[in-house]
Swiss-Prot record:
<keyword id="KW-0133">Cell shape</keyword>
<feature type="transmembrane region" description="Helical">
    <location>
        <begin position="26"/>
        <end position="46"/>
    </location>
</feature>
<feature type="transmembrane region" description="Helical">
    <location>
        <begin position="183"/>
        <end position="203"/>
    </location>
</feature>
<dbReference type="Pfam" id="PF00953">
    <property type="entry name" value="Glycos_transf_4"/>
</dbReference>
<feature type="transmembrane region" description="Helical">
    <location>
        <begin position="98"/>
        <end position="118"/>
    </location>
</feature>
<comment type="function">
    <text>Catalyzes the initial step of the lipid cycle reactions in the biosynthesis of the cell wall peptidoglycan: transfers peptidoglycan precursor phospho-MurNAc-pentapeptide from UDP-MurNAc-pentapeptide onto the lipid carrier undecaprenyl phosphate, yielding undecaprenyl-pyrophosphoryl-MurNAc-pentapeptide, known as lipid I.</text>
</comment>
<feature type="transmembrane region" description="Helical">
    <location>
        <begin position="311"/>
        <end position="331"/>
    </location>
</feature>
<keyword id="KW-0131">Cell cycle</keyword>
<dbReference type="GO" id="GO:0051301">
    <property type="term" value="P:cell division"/>
</dbReference>
<keyword id="KW-0997">Cell inner membrane</keyword>
<dbReference type="GO" id="GO:0071555">
    <property type="term" value="P:cell wall organization"/>
</dbReference>
<keyword id="KW-0472">Membrane</keyword>
<feature type="transmembrane region" description="Helical">
    <location>
        <begin position="160"/>
        <end position="180"/>
    </location>
</feature>
<keyword id="KW-0808">Transferase</keyword>
<dbReference type="InterPro" id="IPR003524">
    <property type="entry name" value="PNAcMuramoyl-5peptid_Trfase"/>
</dbReference>
<dbReference type="GO" id="GO:0008360">
    <property type="term" value="P:regulation of cell shape"/>
</dbReference>
<comment type="similarity">
    <text>Belongs to the glycosyltransferase 4 family. MraY subfamily.</text>
</comment>
Amino acid sequence: MLYHFLYPLSGQFGLFNVLRYPSFRIVAAGLVSLLIGLLLGPLFIERMRVLQYGHSNVREDTPERHKKKAGTPSMGGALILLAVTVSTLLFADLGNRLVWAALLVTLGYGVIGFWDDWLKISKRNSKGLAGKKKLVLQVLVVLAVYYGLLTDWQPRTTDGFPFLTIGSLVDLHLTLPFVPTHLFSPSLGWLYLPFMIFVVVATSNAVNLTDGLDGLAIGPTIVSSMTFLALSYVAGATIAGFSLAEYLRIAYIPGAEELGVFCSAIFGAGIAFLWYNTYPASVFMGDVGSLALGGGLGMLAVLTKNEVASAILHGVFLAETVSVILQVWSFRTTGKRIFRMAPIHHHYELKGWAEPKIIVRFWIMSIMLALVALMSLKLR
């Protein structure tokens, strides 16, 4: 917004010329998002406490220490979304469809998460929105954004009959980490859309599963946002006419550098939220936060052509999800459990690990995996 309103005035006010640089707007978005989260955090937490919008997602088989967390203010993800949205709208180029796609999927998933949280709070149980209904809504959000923003509808006429042809604004080729795009980058064609939906929905639900300990989900989310900031910038930026993507032999995505503003906004909001969510947490993000952030990260993976690399970057989220899948499969087929409890962070809790130790070690793993993902830029 500031880019559109103030940059045209740079001729009269030279200071506004800095808005032409994505690098400046990326830093500014992160700082503003951080300040919004830090300043509004206490007010939000107190309001949730007064309204008794507390954590009620406590299962009967949950570790004993978690039962003490019942009543802690929840739905802190709404504050994250506010900070991310305001910062992105202020500093991003609003003519960039990629930015809108990432933001709208994030907000759409936030609405789904809010509905889920509201049902849990109003009915005082851990069930919330039915799993199948939630999944259908997640798919519909991605479809709406894809056909509404990422599709080029081209009117044509054949034999006097008008019709529309569809051109995707998203590259339908699959890119692999550590493999130069000119050597191997197969086109998925029409299969790319279901693949895209899978990446976004799976990432969203994986973050949701990880959000079980104080600060556990937001830590890797912060790491991922900074990693995607770097990945998006090199995918779209040109310096003195020189394409970083061409030099690194990765897919060139025009306008992808603007996604750095969105990534920075997530980073700033995430740091601010962690200030209040760190052990012992004063607020939980709820599904409104975990589903939204996961959806946003999934879209970033798609829009920057790092769908496969995101499996490395999001290794912590992936491990949590796989642990649940294996646990359910093992119990249904053999009647035995592989882990003491799933997701796997609860397994370590029941082994006697202190909650902060589990959280920090998962953060360390997330940082290590992010470094591997970044290494894939050069090792091709």
